[in-house]
Amino acid sequence: IADRPDARSAPAFRGQLAFRNLHFAYDNGARPVFKGLDLKLDAGEHVAVVGPSGIGKSTLSVLLLRLYDPQEGCIEIDGHDIREWKTASVRRQIGLLPQDALMFAASIRDNLACAAGRKVSDAEIIEAAKLANAHDFITALPEGYDTVIGERGATLSGGQRQRLAIARLALRRCPIVVLDEPTTGLDRASEAVVRHAITRLIDRRTALMITHDLDLASQADRIVYVDQGGIAESGTHAELLKNDGPYAALWQIHRQAVGDLQAKAALADTGSDT
């Protein structure tokens, strides 16, 4: 996406975010992803976006980072259409935590420091790692922060990679953070550790959480259920459960799945004791 000829550098963001009357389709309109979607986040608010698989929830992050522009409507930050600004200056102030963050074949220290966009001290790196629940596993490695990890972090577990990605975002100090399925593919124990780190990361930041992890979504200030190109319902976790709508139905399926996993684990423990 090219910048407008008159685009200027974005100022420091306060963090208010709005998707206004958003219409978007990847394939020239044949299968619209959004049909007039409206969503506003106050500065510092945490909003979870949930809904059926395959409906394009992650497209919100694609449009916010201007990998595409909407066919109609606009995205505003602090009341300004983001197309007024140079895209690079917008992206510098938005942190993205994807499902599988990119890691380099370099030391853990360099992997953390490279994303900061400024010179960072060892003390800052350690502080960020502690926030991300990564410091203990890093210091347990033979070379600690000087440990060289494989290409794409192949020598680390999925949970360890996500915690390093969270530490990198902490060092960037972005006022807006987008979480795009950050716990997908992790085991239950790793999910819990990463979820706790996310809670600390987004403190005092605006957070858009696109997720199937309803335990993570339930912690948000507000939950938005997206379906058929728009918002089907919106509210707090408690409000949506009381509404007994699509979110409540999804939550019941989630709780049943968790209960089944816990029952299987209990049976396995019983078998190992005999």
Predicted regions and their residues:
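ABC-type nucleotide-binding domain
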Residues: 3, 10-274
